[in-house]
Amino acid sequence: GGHLVVIDSAEKWTRVAQLADESGLTYVWIGLYRADSGELAWVKDNVDPVYNWAAGEPSVRDTNGAAENYVLIARRSDGWYYNDCIGDPAAKYPQFYGGKTGYIIEIDP
C-alpha cells in the first residue's frame, strides 16, 4: 500500500523539495492533516516529523473563514514551505491552484 508522503527526516524533506522542484508544480500535498481533535496528525503513526512552516502558518482558517484541515507544501521565491489549506483549493481559487497542484505518494515496504 501507499499513502501521501510523511516527512520524518531532514533527508526526506530535502528529497521531497527536490521532487517538488522537478515536478514544475507550485503546490504538493503531503500526509499531514488536522485530526478531529484539532491537532495536526500524520497519516502514519510514530513519526518524528520535520516541519518547515511558511510565516503565519498554520493559520487554521483561510481568509474567508473556511477550515484548513489539510497540509501541502507551497513553493515560494526562497524555497518550499508547509501551508495548511482547505480540501479543494483549486475549486475555490482556480487562479492560484488550478493545474499547479500535485501530490507525492510514499509506498510502504
Q: What role is predicted for each listed range?
A:
Residues 1-109:
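Extracellular, disulfide-bonded carbohydrate-recognition/adhesion ectodomains
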